[in-house]
């Protein structure tokens, strides 16, 4: 499937022959550079252009220092002001369009921050946004999943600026052996369209889902939330994160930040253990890139077995205690 975007004629003085730089928008919390940015830089390297990182935040000097060490980065641009503290797109989007006047590519990780920001940037630039790419074929052509990952679309854009979100699980993390220069951007875009109210972060002793090397997830087959303690005991032995299918979340077994899938978190751990999960398309889209998939389900016809490297047809309430004891 090929989709060709034909941009409108614009009276821009941008000369693409001379300006072929990629701007990566950093994903961070004002203290640490998130690993998703490293995956995005790897995608930018496949485009093959000079790469710069933009950090918009408040008191984010440590983030800039982290970004400067990312291999392949020529420059880190820092916009440090209270109006960027919570990275509201109404403030950050005009900042990006100002900074990116000499850039041909604008990339961000397909996280909540990137998905919230890049559509607004694309609208301000009057170009199409390309979402969730998993492969770079050349500077104009990219591959992205469609139909919950059951098909891949090859998307070609002739827009003068490509605005792209990157599926981070499809690219490895860039190394941190660089020594880029750090520059300040003094642009301030205060706005009154939106106001930050509050945020509540989930705290857990376990690894964060998108960064975990081992994940054990439960589905509707767990029957109720109390039975997730069986997963917790195994997770404690493995040092694993705990996930869930949408069915388990919708049933109220666990909070929605456990959800793995197309409408949840996209993960690609070294080991993914699916327990009592039938394997709906939406769930498979979120975990099928895992290096090793183990499925435990009493229904031998469950779709999850079609993607599993190892499958066990058994009663999870018998298997999990035995597994926990064996570990």
Region locations from a protein language model:
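N-terminal glycine-rich FAD/FM-binding segment characteristic of electron-transfer flavoproteins
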Residues: 3-327
